[in-house]
Each structure stands twice: as structure tokens, then as C-alpha cells.
UniProtKB/Swiss-Prot annotation:
Keyword terms, alphabetized: Disulfide bond, Endoplasmic reticulum, Glycoprotein, Golgi apparatus, Secreted, Signal
Major localization class: secreted
Secretion signal, residue range per the UniProt entry: 1-18
Annotated protein name in UniProt: Fin bud initiation factor homolog
CC per GO annotation: endoplasmic reticulum; extracellular region; Golgi apparatus
Compartments where found: Secreted; Golgi apparatus; Endoplasmic reticulum
Encoding gene (name): Fibin
Pfam families for this protein: Fibin (PF15819)
Length: 217
């Protein structure tokens, strides 16, 4: 009879290995819905939350009460009231977390009543910004085209002025050449006239000298 009792006691102890069977120590929270407890009662920054995390069940039965350590474990086990106290603290923490989430959502909504209204307002703002940017781009393209047209007209005007100056210079050059040709012709005519007059003067001089010699003889 002793051997079966030992087997059942070992089985129940094995089942209770994953549950807390000691007193309630000071607790710490990481800001979420989870609660952690400091085993040594002194919270430090290097305490590992995974090692401090404990599991509670709402039950009035005592855990691991068989065997020689039954009395000590019964003194250290949590009562139903204590477990409800722990659950109440967890609910309070959950309420604080939900309140923080609600405040975060209200900050995100920026005064709007719902995400739908907030998204509609954001979409309107984005649409207005897009319309303004599209309008600005259209005005910029129009100014760019006007600048290109003005540059084209100015370039065309410069080309016309240059061609006009070139035609005028060509006409002046032609006129100058014509004048120079005319002057050359006049110069040749004048030279021919002077030579002709020189020839006539030479002949008259010879005739005069011959006539004077005959009279003297």
C-alpha cells in the first residue's frame, strides 16, 4: 500500500511542478497584460522576466499537499481570495494598458471620432495637396513653354537681323565694286586723254619749231 501512495504522490508533484506554490512576492510589470513577480522580493534591473513569470489558477484546492512537505506547501499556497486579488491587479493593469491604447488612438485620430473620418480627412488633404502640386506643375510647364517661345522668337529675330545686315553689307560691297570699276574706267579714259593731249602738244611743238627754222633760213 505504501508503494502506490508514493507513485500517486510523485505523479501529483510532477503535475504541480509548473505552478507557483510559495508566498506572493512584490510584483513588477513590463507595461503589457503580463505580470511578473520578483522571487527574492528585491527588484533589480537584471531580473529576468521569463524566470519571474508565474502561472496561477483560480482553485480552492491545495497543490502538492501530499507527503512530508504537505503542511509547508499548504501554508505557502495561495488561497482563492489571494488569487482573486492577483487577478484584480491584472485587470487594473489591463485597464491602464487599454487606457493608454485609447489615448494613443485618440492622439492618432487627431480629434476625429473614428478612423473612417480621420482617413477621409487625410485623403482630402492628400487630394488637395496633389491638386495644388499638379496646378503648380501645370503653371511651371506653361511658363517653360512661354520661355521657349520667347527664346525662339528672339532667336528668329536675331537671325532675321543678321540676314538683313548680311544682305545690306553685300549690297554695299557690290555698290563699292561698281564705283571702283567706274573710277578705273574714268582713270583709264583720263590717262588716254592726257596721252592724246601730250601727243598733240608734241606735234604742235615740232610744227612750230620747223616753221621757225624755215623763216630764219
Amino acid at each position: 500500500m505504501v508503494f502506490p501512495k508514493l507513485i500517486w504522490m510523485g505523479f501529483f508533484c510532477h503535475l504541480c511542478r509548473g505552478y507557483f506554490d510559495g508566498p506572493l512576492y512584490p510584483e513588477m510589470s513590463n507595461g503589457t497584460l503580463h505580470h511578473y513577480f520578483v522571487p527574492d522580493g528585491d527588484y533589480e534591473e537584471n531580473d529576468d522576466p521569463e524566470k519571474c513569470q508565474l502561472l496561477f489558477r483560480v482553485s480552492d484546492r491545495r497543490r502538492c499537499s501530499q507527503g512530508e512537505g504537505g503542511q509547508a506547501s499548504s501554508l505557502l499556497s495561495l488561497t482563492l481570495r489571494e488569487e482573486f486579488t492577483v487577478l484584480g491587479r491584472q485587470v487594473e493593469d489591463a485597464g491602464r494598458v487599454l487606457e493608454g491604447i485609447s489615448k494613443s488612438i485618440s492622439y492618432d485620430l487627431d480629434g476625429e471620432e473614428s478612423y473612417g473620418k480621420y482617413l477621409r480627412r487625410e485623403s482630402h488633404q492628400i487630394g488637395d495637396a496633389y491638386s495644388n502640386s499638379d496646378k503648380s506643375l501645370t503653371e511651371l510647364e506653361s511658363k517653360f513653354k512661354q520661355g521657349q517661345e520667347q527664346d525662339s522668337r528672339q532667336e528668329s529675330r536675331l537671325n532675321e537681323d543678321f540676314l538683313g545686315m548680311l544682305v545690306h553689307t553685300r549690297s554695299l560691297l557690290k555698290e563699292t565694286l561698281d564705283i571702283s570699276v567706274g573710277l578705273r574706267d574714268k582713270y583709264e579714259l583720263l590717262a588716254h586723254t592726257i596721252r592724246s593731249h601730250g601727243t598733240r602738244l608734241g606735234r604742235l611743238k615740232s610744227d612750230y619749231l620747223e616753221g621757225g627754222a624755215q623763216k630764219t633760213g
